[in-house]
Amino acid sequence: KAGKYRLIRLAEAKIVAGSPAPDFTLKTADDKNFTLSSLRGKYVVLDFWGSWCGWCIKGIPEMKRYYDRYKSKLEIVGVDCNDTPERWLAAVEEHRLPWINVYNPKDVPAAEDISVEYAVSGYPTKVIIGPDGLIIGKYAGEGPDFYEALHKTIQ
């Protein structure tokens, strides 16, 4: 655990506005490989969440509203963390998540953990990425600052 948190602290310096978003490949709910760079040309929100996270679940209706409003220019990628595959898939189905959903396995080494690479230290964490693949902003928690920034960015 200590090594994981040290890596998160090191990653924080790289996950800032204007920096390239680290590329990754993870499995989708239908067991296909998804690579972040495949969405170049669109705005992207990485939503780091888990089925166990109350605030993550409470934020789903608002995320759906923004997704419906901006889906012609925006893709959301739900990155499930610290879950079992079964709980993740059940949550995707139960909450009818309409966007891309990928699973970040909890048993991978910290150096291969996407949540570590994106310096996620709490949930939910949302990262807005521009069509050029550069990070626009990172937002921890479920609050209006993320939605205001997203609206201002995409409008």
Regions found by a protein language model. Give the residues of each.
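Structural recognition of the beta-strand scaffold that forms the well-ordered cores
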Residues: V44-D47, E75-G78, I100-Y103
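Alpha/beta-hydrolase fold active-site loops
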Residues: Y43-V44, P124
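Conserved redox-active cysteine motifs that mediate thiol-disulfide chemistry
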Residues: R40-G41, D47-R65
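Thiol/disulfide oxidoreductase modules built on the thioredoxin-like
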Residues: L97, K106-I154
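Structural microenvironment flanking redox-active thiols in thiol-disulfide oxidoreductases
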Residues: K58-R96, D107-V116
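N-proximal helix/coil linker or "cap" segments that precede and/or mark the start of modular domains
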Residues: K1-K27, K32, S37, K42, ...
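Active-site acidic short loop of glycosyltransferases
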Residues: R40-K42, S72, L97, V120
